[in-house]
Amino acid sequence: MDAPEIHYETEDFGDILKKDARFDPRAYDFVLQVISEASASAKGHVTGAELLDWFRDLALDAYGPMAYAVLTDWGVKTCEDVGDIVFNLYNAKRIAKTDSDSPADFIGGFDFRQEFLGPFEA
């Protein structure tokens, strides 16, 4: 799986950041890339759990042992944060969702410290 290319432009997320400034614009860009990769691979809709798996894998591919530091620097510290980003993107009409999609789909997905630091601890 190739790491997504990051195309960073602050103004792309200005409307979202005015409503919720918790996350760096690069976090939104990365999540959009994850959604794009996951949707293309699945050839359609991706569940919250599937999206979290893709998020973890692509973050590790892109940032390796720095993934945890990069994500937390962007304000993304939990799976619930990923869900908040996804639903902020939905509310800003950047992505679509199904009736069954919910922020609850992202609760308790995995432990960020364990998944992003664990593979690199001696």
Question: What residue spans do the PLM features occupy?
Answer:
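Non-transmembrane, aqueous-exposed alpha-helical and coiled segments at domain scale
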Residues: D2-A122
